[in-house]
């Protein structure tokens, strides 16, 4: 048995060397070295064990995909992230991965990402009309506001590309043709990490639990970035009252009966959700209404508060799910569960206090969470 295992490893090693140095000699040597550092032995062991166990039959998958919006310069940060997601979850399932960029990906980026992922990979370019600043924005006013926010020390306060990204994730990512075939998506950003082994399929959990949207981290939005977002939302509700769900989560996003925004939101750099919510008539109307207000560029409206307000108003509160068992990190924040094979220090949540957004969410939804 040991001889068979050794032989398989040697053969796989030669295959990897052939692919790297013969088929793709243009990949920088430093990049090849970086790839070799990331658990080559672990990957060989994984595929070796599957071969020996005869366990190569594909498992039934949900109609789902990973989604990453990235630039070519994010390649090295993504190498670590993709390896972690593959080793701690996707190598057991082989879900596809959709990569989007506002410009064409390089051949090196596509080759490396395709080698790292266990499922199919697809690479797309964002439609320029959905990425560029719309014509109704007064750029003199916008630049003046950007400079002010930058002077005030607001994170990304003066950054144009950040605003473009927030607007794209608020109203357009789900319209990309590469996402048309799918029902569920899992958003992954460069430099993020899974801190635990993910033993349950989150896509399947959403379907079986009849949930629409899943998250791991909640926090308060920076008030300076969304001064008019709530009033714009109230205008929308007055115009389209039929969009409100009966058992919505109004109290989570406003603790004074709608006078002010609580600033609580789901941190959207990690979200696992049903794309049909964003495809819905209610959400489309809401985004189009906000887009005409110009707050993505005159202020710094993020996709996180936009998603969160829409989810809290247009969905039954029982459609929202806290993936408390999934450990996740996006510096400087992380979520570390109490249970599971994790590589972090577990956190405590005081459910007796409404000072945190997650405590308020749990108290309002009355769900039982094993980790708490």
Curated annotation (Swiss-Prot):
Keyword line: Endoplasmic reticulum, Glycosyltransferase, Membrane, Signal-anchor, Transferase, Transmembrane, Transmembrane helix
Recorded GO MF terms: alpha-1,2-mannosyltransferase activity
Residue ranges, Lumenal side: 28-372
Highest taxon, organism lineage: Eukaryota
Active site: 271 (nucleophile)
Glycosyltransferase found in the keyword field: yes
Segments on the Cytoplasmic face: 1-6
Primary location class: endoplasmic reticulum
Topological type in the membrane: Single-pass type II membrane protein
Annotated TM spans: 7-27
Record EC number: 2.4.1.-
Task performed by this protein: Probable mannosyltransferase involved in O-glycosylation of cell wall and secreted proteins.
Protein name: O-glycoside alpha-1,2-mannosyltransferase homolog 2
Protein source organism: Schizosaccharomyces pombe (strain 972 / ATCC 24843) (Fission yeast)
Organism lineage string: Eukaryota, Fungi, Dikarya, Ascomycota, Taphrinomycotina
Designated gene of the protein: omh2
